[in-house]
Amino acid sequence: MTVSLEERLLQNLAAPRADTRSVTPSIRAFAQAIDRQRAGLERVPLLAGARPDLATAARRLEEAEVAALAVELDDPQIELAAVSDVARASAVPLLRTDLLLEEFQIYQSRAAGFDAVLLVAAHLPDPVLARLCSAARSTHMAACVACATAVEIARAAQARADAIALPAAPAIAAELLAALPRRALILALTSGAPEPKHLLGRADAALDRALGAAADPAAAFRAALAEED
């Protein structure tokens, strides 16, 4: 994440609050889109919300048959409008991955067209984590909870997370895999391009920063798939 905790708190203080009555439920199922039953690994390109060609990159990735897209926002008040344009034209679900700390951000995300949100367990006390997961469910969004310890995985399960996001450097630690609830949907978090050989059979999908940062993400996506065949 490129925005610090302190920066996001300041942004939140100045952010307008969406009227929750006008927020419509998501109809694009992120969890279903990435669920490969561990038979394969879905790459989810992570695009920067400030990317000048965001709409074009998203459209071309959809044409390349990505299962889902992720977007990270540095300045939501500026970048959410571009996400809304993408969401209106997209048939694939959108995951928001930047720092979410307050309930209003969940409704803000859905109002912009996101279908899933990434929540970081380390930044959210139990009551807040439960409230944000509940808010996501109320709008039919998937709540993906990023966990770095077995304790955080247990907290995510208690909050009824739709998916567990785990660090992969390049593999997911055995102790984290052992702590997962049965049939948990797993999203691997990598610092660059995921390595399928380390993740196949262990994760359903992986955020791919390298694809999202490429000059032509769709071409990079197709090339990555060709290498796996």
Predicted regions and their residues:
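Conserved N-terminal beta1-alpha1 strand-loop-helix module at the mouth
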Residues: M1-L94, L101-F104, A135, T139-A165, ...
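A short alpha/beta connector and helix-capping loop motif
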Residues: Q105-H123, L129
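C-terminal active-site rim and adjoining tail of enzyme catalytic domains
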Residues: P167, L187-D229
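Solvent-exposed, charged amphipathic helical/linker segments at domain boundaries
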Residues: L124-C133, V145
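Active-site-proximal loop->helix
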Residues: S84, R110-A112, R131-A135
